Amino acid sequence: MNILKHFPSYVGPSKIRTLVIPIGHWTRKEFNNAVQKLSEFNEIHLSDVTPIDSPIFTPQGFPHGKLFFDFLTIDHDDALELFLYDFEPFRKTFVIIGLVNDYSDPLTNLNFMKEKYPTLISPNLVYASSTPTKELEQTIDTMENVFASSPDMQKNIETIMCDIARNFLTALNSYYSSYKHVTLRSPGAIGGNAVLKTTLIRQNSYTSSSSSTPMSAVQSSVSSSSKAGSVTTASKRLSSFEMTTNSLKRSASLKLATTLSTSENRSQQKSLGRQMKILGNFQLLAGRYVDALNSFVDAITTLYKVRDYLWLGSALDGISICFLLLSYLGLSYQIPQIVSLICPVEKLNFESSSTGISPVDSNSKATASTTASSTPRNSISIAAMQSPRNSIMSLSAPALNIDVENINLPLLIKCISDKVLYYYDLSLMHNSEYAPQVVYCEFLLKTLTFMTSCYKSSEFSKDVLDNIVKNQHRALSDIPNSPMFPRFEVYFYSNKLFELQLKEMQVEAQIKIYSTMAEVYRLLGYKRKQLFVLRLLMVALLATPNKIAWHPDYRTLIDTIIELLNINESEAKINVDDPSQSTWLILQKKILQLCIKVSRKINDFEYVAKFSSILITKYTHLLNQSEQDALFKEYIQPSITNESITSYWDPFILREVVINRILDSDPTSNEIPLESDVSSLESLENRQKTQDINPQEVFNPFKRVQPTSFVSNNSTKVPILVFLVGDKAEFTCRVQNPFKFDFTINDIQLDEEISEFCEIDRKAVSYSGPYNVKAESIRSITLPLIIKKPTYKKIYEISCLKISILKLPLQKFDIINDSRRSNPVEEEAEYSKCIYGKLKIKILPEQPQLELLSTSKMTRNSWMMLDGTKTDFHITVRNKSLSCAINHIKIIPMNNIEQMLKPDYWKKMPPDDLYIMEKQLDWLSKSCVRIIKLPTVIKPNETITFDLELDNTAVPFNFTGFDLLIEYGMSATDESCIYLKKLSIPYEVTLRRTIEVPSMDIIPLNELFSSQVENVDWIEYVMSKIRAESNLHSRDFILLLLDFRNSWIDGIKLNVQFEDFTSNEYHVEASHTSRIIVPIKKIDYKKYNFENTPIPRIYPGRQFIQSGLNEEQTIEMRQKFWCREHIISKLKCNWKLTTDQSVTGSVDFNKFIEKFDHKMVYTIYPGRLFYGVQLLLDEPKVKVGEIINLKIITEPTSTCRRKQNSTVNFLDIVIFDSKTSKILPRSNRRILYNGSLTKPISTTKVSEINLEIIPIEKGRYEFSVCISKSNNQDGIIQFDSENVILSVI
């Protein structure tokens, strides 16, 4: 029997207590299954039981009856109820059944049971052996109380139970005979102070109102359907009860005066009444319900006369049980008159056609009809039973007996129960004849369970009776609209139990009371009331010093409390603005403390550990210092010792993890290499053949090789920690202790996955541990980290650590960076309460290390150079590694000009300036610094030397130095990637200026020179060209005037070249300037169409913004640009020092020659003019009066065709006096001409003009032309610089 699941049945006194014990070799599961099989036949029909030789208990006396067996596996303590056996004999355990699964001797087993349980009157054995021996079978056949079944308890169980029932009836007959000649005393008279008297906490108002609910109210409540009707009924109950009670008192006084003349007669009547009451109890056990009803009626009649209230109440209880059992059997009966007197009954009115009505169904559909006949309310036909015997007729006429079909039976039972309590209350005034508190309480309990069973239905049906008799109880899914007993009435009735001093009762009795009330509250849906009662039950269990025989299902009690409190699901978050929530959390805390104490008392360390963890985890903020200390020392530590707690309860202990490299003093040894795929390097080299610099940005050597795995990813905030095998690293973790007691950390380890590659130094942990973490503090623990093995490309995450706390096994704890604030919008279960941290770690193999030993000629990597010179250096480096070779090496120079430029420098520059700048940058990146004889492999600990050539011929004046970036590394073992490192060597270069070109000019050449000056280099060059080419004239040349300044401290010799012209060597003293003239042919505009040639781009792919220049401005920019490029690309100058001719250099004219202006472009590039003009004379020298022809050829250029809308322009011939440079008038006496000096010319084709001239005065004359849009010289579009000179002698 599970005392924690006690739910007494109202008809419990009719059930035979039967103890079932195991004999042999049973397991708990097998024995429980066997008892369960036996329990399936707990109801035995008397008609199936063999008759016995007893007129009182023979089954033949009432074949409709049944025997109810209540199977127990735990026996009652006889000492607790010994004094109650004379008053309520049904409390005794009568039958014992030994289940035997071996081949032991039956007689031995019977003797064992009689010795161990001597008070049990009917011992029986049931053999469940598989194959009993023949001798055993013969023994079983010869013994009446030994039976044989199968191992699965399926064979002959019903027959066996019928035989056990017969044995019980036989034993009961003998047992009852001992009562016949015994004076029956009340429990208080037998036990004295050992029997606890019922004690009420406050004055019981029960006797004045609710104890005698009249039957008029019982019957009228059937038809009540409104609240107003209920109030009226209540008033009727009170007034009817008062009138009935007064009449009963007067009637009883008259009868007592005539019947009780002496005290001896009174004693005899009391003894007789008690004997009849005991007989009724035994007849209930024997299934003789009609006889029991008669016995109880006789007992009530007698006891009522002598005012034996205790036994009278018990007899009334027996009558109500008889009513229910007869209704359960479906038999009709009548309510005795004595019941009508004590609990006045009014008949219900039905239609006259009612015949053969079942008492069950008659009470299932009550009606408010007041007609003289009733409508049948069932279809069950029950044989009519004989009325109770005539002893009841002595007080009243038979006409006062009421058929059960005419009353509301549930309310009658409730009315009788109230009357029983009324008599029990009256008995409390006696010093020995009082109701023991256990009797009082158990009667309240079974009445409460009866009302609860009726509450679950709106009609008194067969199902309700089954629930009452078979003690079936389960929670309702749907509450009926009109239950027989409203829920509030059942609840108020349960409060009567709190009017008693329950704590003085035996602990077993308290457990029964509290467990029953808890189940009632569960069925009624009062969860908090259920929780309250279960807490009282726990307190009662905890307070008793006695050893309690705990049922294996005791955990259900604790689990129910935890479930009602919603502890497992709820989070203990306190809201200071909600006092009710705080109170509820405090209640949860106290219940948990209680559960821990109870679990500890019964040595259930698993539950102690479970609830201790919940309490310390979720309710820390509600526990003070002493509570936390006691919880830790008394429960948590012992649970850890006995291994009930195997893991630390706080998952948020680990707050931060940091891993740092311990750096060396040499910064180059601390460098982490980049990891790059071999394929990416090969494709990069192919791309560099066509493009060495990213066109979008200035040159950046570290964008040439992108690492494949170790790349800073802006999308993730977790950086990758990269280490090298053999690195010294330091591991630091921060742990928190939010509790008010100290704890120790015994071990810290990394996760298994990463421990293969790196691990915390175990020796350091053993040496410095354990680590004590003070209460309510955070401690940092720092330990060495050993880097063992490379992970290569794979990246591992450290999101947790394995920590051993309080000597518990290693346990994983996530890294908690911070707590996340609650989001009122986001309430999903997936919303995490914490911000978890993690470290990404990658371990590369051991790497080579390159160091610079020396650079020749330099002191501290600094050097002074003359502008325009070149020099060589020898650089010596060494591989410091003793095990790793360098099999990839690349040197990338980077000067300060490239470093200073912004990435978007090109966006606001015009195309011509951009070309000049990027051409210079391109030269700087390709030609300024060159590496010679670079090795491909450097072995471990090998020293090598390579050459570096520094060219300063074209560097700008703001060049101050460069960095030599040595990119080196080693291939992976599988050659899938290369690990790259860099060594940056800075060099400072100081430039000293040598030859500068401060100014430059361009002038036309219009006449030839005499032979006397042909020794000049440039004149000699022009004259030789004219002689060699007949169509070449002096006007086809221009003169480039260059000023060279020597800014150095020594003299310099230099020469200039332009195409095939080479000047003489000029000596320029220090701080002096010399002009050198360079003859240059004019640019043939027919061959070089500059206006249609765009300015080139060094780095194609630029997305230029519109410059804002119109077409003419663009053409003008192109012409200026290409004229400058034409000159600079062919102009060269070499020099050497006069003091040391081994020091040579060159001049980069890009640094000195600015953009050309319009005059320079007009002079060097005729395509800029509207017309190409040629002036030709037959002879350059004539005599006075000699006729000469002047031929002028004009050819319109593309400029003319693009800009001119008209088809004709006008050409004016202009004559100058070469000596005075004055223009001669059109009409003069020095030169005569035939025709007009103004001639029309075409804008689309070549025009040829001939003019005959007769000089009449000696002199030197220049002929030139002026082209205008009209014949009056307005709108001049070109005044040609071309002229021809005529000498007249």
Swiss-Prot record:
GO terms for biological process: early endosome to Golgi transport; intra-Golgi vesicle-mediated transport; retrograde transport, endosome to Golgi. Residues 354-365 have a biased composition (Polar residues). It is found in: Golgi apparatus, cis-Golgi network. It holds the Pfam family TRAPPC9-Trs120. Residues 354-374 are annotated as: Disordered. Present with 259 molecules/cell in log phase SD medium. Part of the multisubunit TRAPP (transport protein particle) II complex composed of BET3, BET5, TRS20, TRS23, TRS31, TRS33, TRS65, TRS120 and TRS130. Interacts directly with TRS65. Belongs to the TRS120 family. Specific subunit of the TRAPP II complex, a highly conserved vesicle tethering complex that functions in the late Golgi as a guanine nucleotide exchanger (GEF) for the Golgi YPT1 GTPase. TRS120 plays a role in the YPT GEF activity of TRAPP II in concert with the two other TRAPP II-specific subunits TRS65 and TRS130. This is Trafficking protein particle complex II-specific subunit 120. It comes from Saccharomyces cerevisiae (strain ATCC 204508 / S288c).
